């Protein structure tokens, strides 16, 4: 029993319309908004701050499983997204799976621990300036009470046959990382108990094929037993270490977890859960499910705020809330992940969630992801910000642009924008059009987003800044949208080859290079004003920078 689910792109440089305050009427453009549309104006005054820029978007990012993190290509890609997108933590499954070699027992049944693979992985993560958001799971085979597994790599999802051994195992692991990295470092980590225990695929299995209503109470009680033992194991090493959960799919069991920890006095330092913007479903173990994106513009956003409300009404008011998985879709075979639509989708959620969540960990940074085994094509709807060949998808640029925003956010008149400044005197404006173009349940994502989807015109955007310091600047404009830094469309245009030659990879890399569509000099006068218009299409994203000229 699983919860219900549905059955089964060369860069184009867009014309920019320039109109500094003293300029003449802007020239016409074939990409202008229809005459019936009003002008969309984005105004900000550099003297009017909104406050520090909220960096919850770069707090954490996800990956498939720990063993994949031992690969050179995985490590190369993580180093790149760390540098470009600023991610600070990384979370993945399978830390305790048998392919990590962490646990055996001798002939007397005594534990034999081995942390060599984990050391290799954590040393790399630590060495590039990141930290692990540790998911405690799955169950080592020697400790498992059953044989139920999940995914191609066979993660055991059964409870421990001896909870005392599990607790000692967790404590020994935490003690080991403390000795290796120091308690001050480990105090900055997070220990999350298990993954999506409200789904039978991830917890206990369901050999009797019970309905969810019949299965869930027993599974939840067993998870709370695992949670309490895990928390004791973590806290036995250092009471200041952070432990949390329930890491559920679909924001389930939040109130029950808060109540359990209150009543049983079990430690709960943070709350975790997951959300995907599909109409139904939570798990696609084989990568064959059909999905439909929710037509609700507030999908994910409203759920995050609802969970925050539950926490604030509990004894844990003010607790950190981490969404340790989120994306447009829960399946690793959904072309929306490769599509230009994803960039605006991500930015809309980051803007509107605001401070309701401490972090939103995008699932995932890479297509090197083998839950349903290795995939057979370079673009297959994988979760990643990067594909196998290190090619950035539009979703990657959403996070890169967010990372390039200055630390001081300015008040903006436009709800689909961030305007910031940095300590160097530069200004950054990030704005987008978010339009759900999917027609609804009549067609699944796997059909709709696999097809060419030209973007229709949207309102022309006018960026109007005031309070800009007089002087010379570079105006640098980077764009993502249909056929602009849109590698899926470029791949489709070359015939969607299943295997890429080196020449084809080079062509695609040029198509998603992230090079500016405009880089020119501008002069800001004594009035401190800057105005420029930008033609918009559905789901276009613009990143605009005013960079003070270097004085000679």
Residue ranges with predicted function:
Residues 7-18:
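Bacterial N-terminal signal peptides
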Residues 281-292, 307-343, 372-386:
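Active-site clefts of carbohydrate-active enzymes
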Residues 170, 187-189, 195, 241, ...:
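Aromatic- and acid-rich polysaccharide-binding/catalytic face
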């Amino acid at each position: 029993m699983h919860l219900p689910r549905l059955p089964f792109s060369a860069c184009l440089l867009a014309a920019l319309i320039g109109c500094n305050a003293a300029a003449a009427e802007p020239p016409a453009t074939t990409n202008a908004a229809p005459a019936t549309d009003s002008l969309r104006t984005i105004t900000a005054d550099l003297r009017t701050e909104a406050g520090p820029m909220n960096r919850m978007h770069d707090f954490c990012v996800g990956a498939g499983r720990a063993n994949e993190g031992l690969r050179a290509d995985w490590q190369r890609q993580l180093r790149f997204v760390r540098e470009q997108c600023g991610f600070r933590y990384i979370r993945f499954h399978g830390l305790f799976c048998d392919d990590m070699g962490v646990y055996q027992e001798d002939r007397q049944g005594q534990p034999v621990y081995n942390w060599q693979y984990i050391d290799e992985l954590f040393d790399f993560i630590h060495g590039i300036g990141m930290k692990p958001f540790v998911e405690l799971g799955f169950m080592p085979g020697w400790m498992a009470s059953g044989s139920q597994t999940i995914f191609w790599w066979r993660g055991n999802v059964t409870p421990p046959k001896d909870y005392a051994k599990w607790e000692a195992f967790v404590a020994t692991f935490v003690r080991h990382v403390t000795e290796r990295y120091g308690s001050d470092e480990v105090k900055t980590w997070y220990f999350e108990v298990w993954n999506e225990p409200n789904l039978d695929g991830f917890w206990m299995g369901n050999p009797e094929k019970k309905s969810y209503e019949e299965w869930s109470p027993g599974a939840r009680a067993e998870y709370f037993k695992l949670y309490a033992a895990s928390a004791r194991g973590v806290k036995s090493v250092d009471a200041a270490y952070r432990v949390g959960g329930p890491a559920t799919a679909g924001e389930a069991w939040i109130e029950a977890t808060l109540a359990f920890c209150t009543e049983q006095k079990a430690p709960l330092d943070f709350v975790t859960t997951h959300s995907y913007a599909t109409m139904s479903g939570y798990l696609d173990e084989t990568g064959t499910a059909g999905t439909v994106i929710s037509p609700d513009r507030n999908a994910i956003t409203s759920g995050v705020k609802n969970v925050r409300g539950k926490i604030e009404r509990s004894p844990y008011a003010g607790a950190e809330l981490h969404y340790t998985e989120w994306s447009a879709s829960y399946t690793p075979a959904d072309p929306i992940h490769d599509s230009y639509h994803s960039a605006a989708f991500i930015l809309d959620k980051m803007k509107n969630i605001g401070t309701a969540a401490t972090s939103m960990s995008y699932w995932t940074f890479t297509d090197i992801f083998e839950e349903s085994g290795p995939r057979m094509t370079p673009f297959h709807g994988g979760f990643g910000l990067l594909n196998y060949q290190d090619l950035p998808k539009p979703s990657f640029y959403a996070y890169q642009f967010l990372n390039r925003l200055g630390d001081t956010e300015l008040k903006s008149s436009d709800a689909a924008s961030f305007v910031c400044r940095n300590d160097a005197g530069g200004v950054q404006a990030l704005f987008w059009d978010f339009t759900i173009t999917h027609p609804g349940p009549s067609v699944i994502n796997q059909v709709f987003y696999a097809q060419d989807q030209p973007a229709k015109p949207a309102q022309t955007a006018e960026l109007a800044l005031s309070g800009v310091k007089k002087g010379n600047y570079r105006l640098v404009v980077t764009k993502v949208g249909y056929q602009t830094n849109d590698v899926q469309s470029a791949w489709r245009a070359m015939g969607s080859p299943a295997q890429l030659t080196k020449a084809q990879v080079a062509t695609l890399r040029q198509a998603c290079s992230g090079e500016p569509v405009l880089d020119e000099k501008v002069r800001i006068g004594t009035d401190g004003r800057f105005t420029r218009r930008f033609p918009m299409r559905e789901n276009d994203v613009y990143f605009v920078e005013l960079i003070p000229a270097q004085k000679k």
